């Protein structure tokens, strides 16, 4: 009789423990409640580097004469840059000669056989000086320098190189904004905000401060650096 009671007690304890483990197993596998939020941070910055390719060309049937005119134009461009405080800013000088008679695919009907083009690349941290000079290129045209259009790449490109210096502050601000949004959601839903489950800083963008149709951010000296952080927070309660 006592052996039967002992066996029944052991069996009952086994059922109780089994139920405890099963219940807690389901609880551990219950889906975690999370909220996904985004935090935005922006900072207005000023370009700290200007890169400006100045391309000009001459054409004719006498190669030596064409090259002489290009040398004259090169002197005019260098003098113009020196006048605007950019005499030491020429980082590169390239020359290209095109002989139309040597182009098998070209038409034999042409006025000038030779085209000689030169490019002076200006690279300067004096952004204001470059901007002022770029607005005065009519002086070069008045001196007979034929500046060549480069389509959407015309004019200087204004760059901001200090992204890495401000990146930590931007990320901190973006995460703070995201946490504030998550805390508000937790409050409104009657929950408590838990730890970060997942985080994605996203891309850091450099945008024109004043957006305009067809305008590139490289054409504007004033820019906006933006970062968007996406975070998943656990919810408690």
Kindly label every feature range from the protein language model.
Residues 2-237:
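Short, charged, surface-exposed interaction patches
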